[in-house]
A protein has these predicted regions:
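Post-HExxH zinc-binding segment in Zn-dependent metallohydrolases
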Residues: 477-516, 564
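Conserved alpha-helical "signature site"
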Residues: 505-636
């Protein structure tokens, strides 16, 4: 590009900045030579990287793209001059709205001529940073202190970051001197901080990167930058953000929606629960009984509706590298890993390998969880009868009650498209598959459990599905990675809150944990069956529980009901909010991420909460949970 073309391009982009910022609109422009300007919304700061023209510098530009306002360019062919002019125009345009202050944070990698802050190697990367400041006319020592503190919290490969501060007048890195001259900074009321980063993410020669190291550094550096921007905004501007998360990106680019849709398409292409559910349970029970409970006939499964190999090909061809937002990239990467493991389990269905994949997906039973389960089985009598009406209702009667509950939510939002289907061939009890509640045609539902089961299946599983559907991310309806534990914990809690928790139900949850632990440690079907019989379960009950655990070849999922319940009880006891748990299908570890995305206005509050929560009796029970109710006290 000629100097004339560069000047013309700069002027055109500057005009776009002025026009769009005046309207409060985002600015996203490609700059010459692989550069990019992204301004999510008017903000009194920007992160900048200008790639040097005298050495390779792979990956450093990605360190600034975590922010809501960033620019990266290359020094050659006037790129540095263009970057300086665009930053000047941006500062000049936005600062009147924020008290006439503006902060520029430039990020560069440590040049070879600069000594490292601390010795590091490619085998044992040690993160470090050197801060250079220039702040004519104002004192930003406190901002430097905030940035330094949060940079020191960065940890890569078990090593905490080292930070060196070079105050005003210090020698700036070659080619990374202040982007704007002091006179211009003074005129704008702006300050610049330059962060020199130890390039631990670069391979030898700096032409390529270590992806995992770069990903970890991006996310942690982005968090440190937001803390510094938050402090700056609070102290020097009129912005006054709610929290540091709220300064993150709000505009979600097309690449994110494309990846979201592709992940959701893979997730909706199969149903692991249905695919590992035996279709011949009744004949297996009859054969097992005829053998005097010594030999188990083989389970049969429905044909797979998807080719796991082809699904994996689609899964791993999704272009995750186009996502700049580290939080969203993290969520999507987790889901990709989970889907890959689930597809492998489909391939291994009916083999010993299925159990290994199941353990990878759901984890083993811990000793504290096992002790809780054993205590329940020992302390809760198998002969205790629950209070309430006796008798049972048919599958069709239950389905009618469930359809009425779905209709309640449809009256609130016409996006509710849930259905209730009575079907043959499902043997593991009530089951939600996406937006459908499946009711086995042979089911007989105890009357005193009807409401509890409706709130378990519809008030939790379908409500979170529809709340997820109402969000911008389709993945919230199919579920973030590992969502099932929190889901099942919430669903079981709903049974207690609606007064439907019975001794038999609590014992069943505990029996699943004991059985899963036995299976994971090599016990056979007959071994687990006999173990449950010794705990006081009938032969039919023992067979049903063992069948759930052994479906597919060893399905560890059943331990998450009690584990999830304990997680939810702890969360609420510690003062956790109820509402975020229903934003969609999420895991407990995603709660802070949900709060971050809500602060950034990427996610909204749940469209609705389960209907049962408005009942006075439920509120009273919820209060008891918050006061520290133990799992054994759920029967009180």
């Amino acid at each position: 590009m000629s100097r004339k073309d560069s000047t013309s391009s700069t002027e055109a982009i500057a005009d776009v900045i002025r026009e769009r910022i005046a309207r409060g609109a985002p600015v996203r422009r490609t700059l010459p030579g692989r550069g990019r300007l992204h301004v999510d919304r008017p903000l009194p700061f920007i992160t900048v990287h200008v790639e040097p023209d005298d050495r390779p510098d792979a990956g450093t530009n990605q360190l600034v793209t975590t922010e809501a306002s960033y620019l990266y360019s290359i020094a050659e062919r006037g790129g540095r001059k263009q970057a300086a002019e665009l930053v000047r125009v941006l500062s000049e345009t936005v600062r009147p709205s924020f008290g006439k202050q503006f902060l520029i944070v430039a990020v560069c990698s440590r040049p070879p001529e600069h000594p490292p802050v601390v010795e590091s190697s490619k085998d044992t990367p040690h993160p470090s940073f050197r801060l250079f400041t220039t702040a004519p006319g104002q004192n930003i020592d406190s901002i430097i202190e905030v940035l330094e503190r949060h940079l020191k919290a960065i940890e890569i490969g078990g090593n905490r970051a080292a930070v060196e501060v070079v105050q005003n007048g210090g020698e700036f890195p070659h080619r990374d001197r202040p982007l704007l001259k002091n006179a211009v900074l003074r005129e704008l009321g702006a300050a610049q901080i330059t962060i020199e980063v130890e390039p631990i993410y670069q391979m030898s020669g700096a032409n390529d990167v270590y992806p995992a190291v770069l990903k970890a550094l991006r996310r942690q550096l982005g968090r440190a930058l937001k803390h510094a921007f938050f402090y700056f905004a609070e102290r020097y501007t009129s912005l006054h953000p709610k929290d540091f998360h709220s300064l993150g990106r709000r505009a979600v680019v097309k690449a994110v929606w494309d990846v979201d849709m592709q992940l959701d398409a893979v997730a909706n292409g199969f149903d692991l629960l249905l695919d590992v559910n035996p279709i011949n349970t009744e004949s297996v029970w009859n054969g097992f009984r005829r053998s005097r409970f010594e030999k188990v006939p083989p389970f049969r499964y429905r044909p797979l509706s998807t080719d796991p190999v082809m699904a994996k090909r689609r899964l791993y061809s999704i272009p995750f590298e186009k996502i700049e937002d580290p939080t969203i990239s993290f969520l999507f990467s987790q889901k990709q890993d989970e889907l890959g493991r689930q597809l492998t389990m489909l391939t291994d269905r009916g083999t010993v390998r299925f159990l290994l994949g199941s353990i990878q997906l759901y984890g083993r039973v811990t000793q504290p969880l096992l002790r809780s389960a054993e205590q329940i089985l020992e302390q809760v009598s198998s002969t205790t009868r629950a209070a309430g009406g006796g008798g049972t209702i048919t599958a069709e009667e239950f389905a009618d009650r469930a359809r009425a509950e779905v209709a309640h939510y449809r009256d609130i939002w016409d996006g509710v498209d849930g259905t209730v289907q009575v079907i043959p061939g499902v043997s593991s009890g009530l089951m939600v598959s996406k937006n459908r509640l499946l009711v086995p045609s042979r089911s007989r539902i105890p009357r005193n459990r009807v409401d509890a089961l409706i709130q378990h299946e519809i008030g939790t599983h379908l409500v979170t599905y529809f709340n997820g559907k109402a969000q911008r991310f389709t993945l919230l309806r199919s579920g973030f990675a590992g969502y099932e534990e929190l889901q099942e914990g919430l669903a079981v809690l709903a049974e207690y809150l609606t007064g439907g928790m019975t001794p038999a139900r609590l014992r069943t949850l505990a029996a699943r944990v004991v059985g899963v632990d036995a299976v994971a440690n090599g016990a056979s079907f007959v071994d687990v069956f006999r173990l449950l019989c010794r705990y006081g379960f009938s032969r039919q009950q023992s067979f049903n529980i063992t069948t759930r655990i052994y479906r597919g070849g060893g399905f560890i999922k059943d331990c998450i009901y009690l584990r999830g319940l304990l997680t939810v009880l702890d969360y609420l006891r510690e003062g956790g909010e109820f509402e975020p748990l229903f934003v969609g299908k999420i895991a407990a570890r995603h709660i802070p991420i949900v709060r971050e995305l809500q602060s950034r206005k990427v996610l909204e509050a749940p469209k609705f909460l389960p209907r049962y929560i408005t009942r006075e009796s439920c509120q009273e029970r919820l209060q008891r949970v918050r006061q520290g109710l133990d799992v054994h006290e759920l029967l009180g």
